[in-house]
Amino acid sequence: MTQYNKLRIEWDCRRGMLELDNVIMPFYRQHFDALSDTQKDTFIRLLACSDLQLFSWFFNRGMATDPQLQQMVDYIQKTLKLTD
């Protein structure tokens, strides 16, 4: 089992756009611990992306070119019921 620096991850969840804060932080607080290590690693990689990229992906204006990142975006949208 991998150790994760949860304080660092929580800090990285804080974004410059309120819309992203309203997606990423609730997902982190409610669902991060239940993710597999692979999913956790992907979520952490997702946090390294720019706010503009994340906004585009979460609000269906584009798709991530990395399939793992897109799967995580889709999973977060489904989990938080952001899509139909």
From Swiss-Prot:
Taxonomic classification: Bacteria, Pseudomonadati, Pseudomonadota, Gammaproteobacteria, Pasteurellales
Functional description taken from the UniProt entry: An FAD assembly protein, which accelerates covalent attachment of the cofactor into other proteins. Plays an essential role in the assembly of succinate dehydrogenase (SDH, respiratory complex II), an enzyme complex that is a component of both the tricarboxylic acid cycle and the electron transport chain, and which couples the oxidation of succinate to fumarate with the reduction of ubiquinone (coenzyme Q) to ubiquinol. Required for flavinylation (covalent attachment of FAD) of the flavoprotein subunit SdhA of SDH and other flavinylated proteins as well.
GO cellular component terms listed in the entry, alphabetical order: cytoplasm
UniProt key word Chaperone: yes
Keywords of this entry: Chaperone, Cytoplasm
Family indicated by similarity: Belongs to the SdhE FAD assembly factor family.
Disulfide bridge positions per record: none
Protein name: FAD assembly factor SdhE
Source organism per UniProt: Pasteurella multocida (strain Pm70)
Compartments, as annotated in UniProt: Cytoplasm
A Pfam family assignment: Sdh5
Domain of life: Bacteria
Matching InterPro entries: SDH, SDH_sf, SdhE_FAD_assembly_factor
Record-level GO BP terms: succinate metabolic process
Primary localization: cytoplasm
